[in-house]
Amino acid sequence: MSDSVRVRFAPSPTGKLHIGGARTAIYNWAFARANGGTFILRIDDTDPTRSTDENTQIILRAMRWLGLDWDEGPEVGGDFGPYSQTERLDLYKQTAERLLAEGKAYPCFCTPEQLAADREAAQARKDPFQGYQRRCRDLTPQEAQARIDAGEPYALRIKVPENRGNVVINDAVHGEVTFDAKELDDFVIFRSDGTPTYNFATVVDDALMGITHVIRGDDHLSNTQIGRSHV
């Protein structure tokens, strides 16, 4: 990771740039400029059903209207591109394959209907829903491969270490924030349609682009524990 400040603003082109997004962009831009760092614009377009090129152009125009220039990103390039997630799919697949090989991820064959039934069963018992039941976590590689070869649809899930302990985040605003790793689900990193999830792609990109500081709203603080689940 670079010793100099590298921050990013990574909007999803599912609509126009809203006030909250503009605020986050300004904070990141100002932090980079104040510290002689690099401000990166990245387009997080992993939602294929809602992301459009038109919205991307609207966001770029809005950034310029705000007087924000970017050092790396669309139209200016950079050493860590491409800067659109749909152009980085091979990087996410390579990372997922490495996690599979290291035993840190596994294929999940559970259907949406099964997952919905688990939630409904918990509600019927008046118990809090504990998330994914990890029924595919302990399949042997041979069992999983046989189901893949049979054409059974599957997603990829991260294998959160069972003895991980607490996830501790040092936040510049809130100080030390602690999450109980036992409450962290074996979250999906690749959907059954072959596309990466937002949280997975974002973590991969931040690592590969050498991002030193993540400036975003409080509503995203809980996402940080997902990225640190194997640290």
Identify what each model region corresponds to.
Residues 1-124, 193-195, 222-230:
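N-terminal Rossmann-like or analogous alpha/beta NTP/dinucleotide-binding catalytic cores
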